[in-house]
Swiss-Prot record:
It comes from Clostridium tetani (strain Massachusetts / E88). Mg(2+) binds at D485, D491. GO terms for molecular function: 3'-5'-RNA exonuclease activity; magnesium ion binding; polyribonucleotide nucleotidyltransferase activity; RNA binding. It holds the Pfam family RNase_PH_C. CDD domains: KH-I_PNPase, RNase_PH_PNPase_1, RNase_PH_PNPase_2, S1_PNPase. Its EC number is 2.7.7.8. Residues 621-689 form the S1 motif domain. InterPro entries: ExoRNase_PH_dom1, ExoRNase_PH_dom2, ExoRNase_PH_dom2_sf, KH_dom, KH_dom_type_1, KH_dom_type_1_sf, NA-bd_OB-fold, PNPase. Residues 552-611 form the KH domain. Involved in mRNA degradation. Catalyzes the phosphorolysis of single-stranded polyribonucleotides processively in the 3'- to 5'-direction. GO terms for biological process: mRNA catabolic process; RNA processing. This is Polyribonucleotide nucleotidyltransferase. Keywords: Cytoplasm, Magnesium, Metal-binding, Nucleotidyltransferase, RNA-binding, Transferase. Belongs to the polyribonucleotide nucleotidyltransferase family.
C-alpha cells in the first residue's frame, strides 16, 4: 500500500512516498522537493556483527547523471566511483545520524541515497539528508529520533531558507544545519568572512526552521511507520568489568595522568599487557569485554579529570593553545611551502602554480564544472607511528581536504587578478589532533610563500567539549589534542581571518549541542584564531612580491572575439605553430582574453607578438616591414602581417621607371611598404616608393634638429 505525505518548506513542496517502490527493502521511500527526487533505502542485518567494537553504519550517496540530463564523459559511458562531492554528501548524512542509534548496537546498517532527478534550485544533498532520517524512522531499525536538515543563505543581512541557485550565487554564507527537536546535531558552513554573531544567529535560524521538518517526520512515523525491532545490544559482562576494574583502575588512572603522549601510551600498553596476563586464562573468550572495560576506564579518568578536577591531560588551561611554530620556504624547487607545527601536530603544505589549462574539470550533477583552486590532504600511517598499506585517499582524507579548501576559497584572488590554477597539498607529518585546521594554517603559509595575493591570511582551530551524562555540565576546550578528541563529545572546527569565519564544521557524539555551547565556542574559537594569525604574520607578514623563479608566468592580452579563429587557424595549425616555435602554453577564452604562460619571458613575448600580428588590423597610411611572397609582371605581393598580403604595383616600386619587378625585389626579400588604401573588397594596396620617401623625410627632419 502506498502512502504520501506533503508539507510546504520555503514555498516549495516537500513530499515523501512510501510503499510505491523497493518492496523488498526494509524501508524504501521517494522524497521530493520541487522537481528534485531522491530514492532512499534503509536496511539492517538481522544479527549483530561479531568481533567488532564499533557501530557498522555505512551511507552511500549515488549520483546519477541522467538526473540532470547528462551522459557521462570519457570512454566508459556509465557512472564510476563516487565523486568527491558524493563522498562529502555521504559523510554529511552519516554524521548527525550516527550518535542517535542505541549504544552498543552492532548490526550492519546501510543507507543508500540515489539521486534520480535534480532541479538546480533544490539541492539533492539536503533532500537526501532529510530522506535518510525519515527512512530510518519509518523502518523497523531501532532509530526513533527524527533529524531535520536545512540550508541557510545570507543576502544583504537577511537569512534565506533553502536558497535557490541564483540566491546561492549571491549569498555570502552556505550553511547546513542538522537538528533534532531539542538540539543541533551537525553544522557545516562555508562563508565569506562572516562574523561570529551573524554565524550564531544563522545557526539559530536554521535550528528553528528544522522544527517543521521534524514534525513532518514525526507525523509520517505516526501514520505509516513500521514497528521497531527490539535491538540486541552489546553489553560488557558486569562481573568481568568489575574484576578488571578492581585490578586495573589504579594503574589506568596513573597512566592517564601522564602528560607526555608517548610515555602515557607506553604506560597504557603496559597496563593492557598486565590485564591480559591476569585474565587471559580465566576469560579466554572475552577479549572484547576486557578491552571495552579498559576503554571505559580510560574515558572515565579523562572526563573526570576535566569535569571534576578542572584540568586537562597535558596540564594546559582550558583556553590554552599548544606551542606553535611556523616556517616557509622549506623546499627549494616547489613554488611555495609552509610548515605549521602545533604541539605534536605537524602539517607541511606545498603550493603549485599552473596555467589555467590545468583547471580541474568536474563531471558531476553539481552546478560547478571547473575548479582553478584545489586542496588535497594526505594522512599517511607514519603520522601516528603506525603501519598500514598506502592506498588512495579515503573518505576522511577527502573530507579534511575539502574543509581546508573551503576555508581558503573566499580568499583566493580572482582569475582576472591572478590568472593561474592553484593546487595545495597538505602532508600530515605528525598527528595529535586537529590536522585539518593545521592544514588551513600550513596552506596560508604556502600561499604567502608562493606569492599568491590572497585577501588575508586564514587560520583554523579545533574546539572540544566534555559533558556529564545528563548534559547539564559542559567544559569547552580550546585546541583539542588526540586524547581529548577521542574521549570527548564534540569536534568544533572553525577557520577564518581577522574579519570573520570562512569555514565551520561541527560534529558531536552526544544527542546535540545547546545554544550556549555553540555561542561560547564560537567566541573562544575567535580568540584562538586571532592568536594563531599573529604567529603566522610573525613568520611571513604578507605574500612575496615575486613568484618563485621556478613558477611559470602568465602574460595576458585581449583580442576581438571574432579574431580568435585567426589565432587558432584551420585545425589548430596556427596556434600549434606558435606553441611549437616559442615553447609556451596558450589558453584562449570565449571573450577574447588570451593567457600565455611560460617560464621563459623571451618565448612569451615572442608569442604575444605573433598573436598581436595575427590579430592586428591593417591601417591605411601605416608603414610595415613585409616579406615578398611572389612577383608578377605587374607588381609584387608582400605579406605585411601573418595572413595579410597586399600588392605593390610595379609603378610604385621605385622613384624611377621599373621595367621588370625582379630588378628591384625578389621573393623572400624584406622591404618597407606603406599602405596607400584598402578598397571595398578588403584588398590592400601598397607602395614601396612612398615608404622610402616617408623614411627619408623623417631622417631629414632629425638632421635639421
Amino acid at each position: 500500500m502506498s502512502h504520501v505525505l506533503e508539507t510546504d518548506i520555503a514555498g516549495r513542496t516537500l513530499k515523501v512516498e512510501y510503499g510505491k517502490v523497493g518492496m523488498l527493502s526494509n524501508c524504501a521511500i521517494l522524497v521530493s522537493y520541487g522537481d528534485t527526487v531522491v530514492l532512499i533505502n534503509a536496511n539492517a542485518s538481522k544479527e549483530p556483527r561479531d568481533g567488532i567494537d564499533f557501530f557498522p553504519l555505512s551511507v552511500e550517496y549515488e549520483e546519477r547523471l541522467y538526473s540532470v540530463g547528462k551522459i557521462p564523459g570519457g570512454f566508459i559511458k556509465r557512472e564510476g566511483r563516487p565523486t568527491e562531492n558524493a563522498i562529502l554528501h555521504a559523510r554529511a548524512i552519516d554524521r548527525p545520524l550516527r550518535p542517535l542509534f542505541p549504544k552498543g548496537y552492532r548490526n550492519d546498517v546501510q543507507i543508500v541515497c540515489t539521486v534520480l532527478s535534480v532541479e538546480s534550485d533544490n539541492q539533492p544533498d539536503i533532500l537526501a539528508m532529510n530522506g535518510a532520517s525519515l527512512a530510518l524512522c519509518l523502518s523497523s531499525i531501532p532509530f526513533t529520533t527524527p533529524v531535520a536538515n536545512v540550508s541557510v543563505g545570507l543576502i544583504n543581512g537577511d537569512f534565506i531558507l533553502n536558497p535557490t541557485q541564483s540566491q546561492r550565487e549571491e549569498s555570502i554564507l552556505n550553511l547546513t544545519v542538522s537538528a533534532t527537536k531539542e538540539r543541533v546535531m551537525m553544522i557545516e558552513a562555508g562563508a565569506e568572512e562572516v562574523d561570529e554573531d551573524t554565524m550564531y544567529n544563522a545557526i539559530r535560524f536554521g535550528f528553528e526552521q528544522c522544527q517543521k521538518i521534524v514534525e513532518f517526520q514525526e507525523e509520517a512515523m505516526r501514520r505509516f511507520g513500521k514497528e521497531k525491532v527490539e535491538p540486541v545490544l552489546y553489553l560488557v559482562d558486569k562481573d568481568i568489568e568489575k574484576e578488571v576494574r578492581e585490578f586495573a583502575f589504579p594503574m589506568v588512572k596513573e597512566a592517564m595522568y601522564i602528560s607526555d603522549k608517548d610515555l602515557r601510551n607506553e604506560k597504557i600498553d603496559e597496563v593492557k599487557e598486565k590485564v591480559k596476563e591476569e585474565f587471559e586464562e580465566k576469560y579466554p573468550e572475552n577479549d572484547s569485554d576486557i578491552s571495552e572495560a579498559l576503554y571505559k576506564m580510560q574515558k572515565e579518568v579523562v572526563r573526570n579529570m576535566i569535569l571534576r578536577e578542572k584540568r586537562r591531560p597535558d596540564e594546559r588551561a582550558f583556553d590554552e593553545i599548544r606551542k606553535i611554530s611556523c616556517e616557509v620556504g622549506l623546499l627549494p624547487r616547489t613554488h611555495g611551502t609552509g610548515l605549521f607545527t602545533r604541539g605534536l601536530t605537524q602539517v607541511m603544505t606545498a603550493a603549485t602554480i599552473g596555467p589555467l589549462a590545468d583547471v580541474q574539470i568536474l563531471d558531476s550533477i553539481e552546478d560547478e564544472e571547473f575548479k582553478r583552486y584545489m586542496h588535497h590532504y594526505n594522512f599517511p600511517s607514519y603520522s601516528v607511528g603506525e603501519t598500514r598499506p598506502l592506498r588512495g585517499p579515503g573518505r576522511r582524507e577527502i573530507g579534511h581536504g575539502a574543509l581546508a579548501e573551503k576555508a581558503l576559497e573566499p580568499l583566493i584572488p580572482s582569475e582576472e587578478d591572478f590568472p593561474y590554477t592553484i593546487r595545495l597539498v597538505s602532508e600530515v607529518l605528525s598527528s595529535n589532533g586537529s590536522t585539518s585546521q593545521a592544514s588551513v594554517c600550513g596552506s596560508t603559509l604556502a600561499l604567502l610563500d608562493a606569492g599568491v595575493p590572497i585577501k588575508r591570511p586564514a587560520a583554523g582551530i579545533a574546539m572540544g567539549l566534555v559533558t556529564n551524562d545528563d548534559l547539564t555540565e559542559e567544559k569547552i576546550l580550546t585546541d583539542i589534542q588526540g586524547i581529548e578528541d577521542f574521549f570527548g563529545d564534540m569536534d568544533f572546527k572553525v577557520a577564518g581571518t581577522e574579519k570573520g569565519i570562512t569555514a565551520l564544521q561541527v560534529d558531536t557524539k552526544i544527542s546535540g549541542l545547546s545554544d550556549n555551547c555553540i555561542k561560547e565556542t564560537l567566541i573562544k574559537a575567535k580568540d584562538a584564531r586571532m592568536y594563531i594569525l599573529g604567529k603566522i604574520k610573525e613568520c611571513i607578514p604578507e605574500h612575496r612580491a615575486e613568484l618563485s623563479p621556478y613558477a611559470p608566468r602568465v602574460y595576458t592580452m585581449t583580442i576581438a572575439p571574432e579574431k580568435i579563429r585567426d589565432v587558432i587557424g584551420a585545425g589548430g595549425k596556427t596556434i600549434n605553430k606558435i606553441i611549437g616555435e616559442t615553447g609556451v602554453q596558450i589558453d584562449i577564452k570565449e571573450d577574447g582574453k588570451i593567457y600565455v604562460m611560460s617560464s621563459d619571458s623571451v618565448g612569451a613575448n615572442r608569442a604575444l607578438k605573433m598573436i598581436n600580428d595575427l590579430t592586428k588590423d591593417v591601417e591605411a597610411g601605416e608603414i610595415y616591414l613585409g616579406k615578398v611572397t611572389r612577383t608578377t609582371n605587374f607588381g609584387a605581393f608582400v605579406e605585411i602581417l601573418p595572413g595579410k598580403e597586399g600588392l605593390v604595383h610595379i609603378s610604385k616600386l621605385d622613384f624611377t621607371r621599373v621595367n621588370k619587378v625582379e630588378d628591384v625585389v625578389s621573393v623572400g626579400d624584406e622591404i618597407l611598404v606603406k599602405v596607400t588604401d584598402i578598397d571595398d573588397q578588403g584588398r590592400i594596396n601598397l607602395s614601396r616608393r612612398d615608404a622610402i620617401k616617408k623614411e627619408e623625410d623623417e631622417k631629414t627632419k632629425e638632421n635639421n634638429h
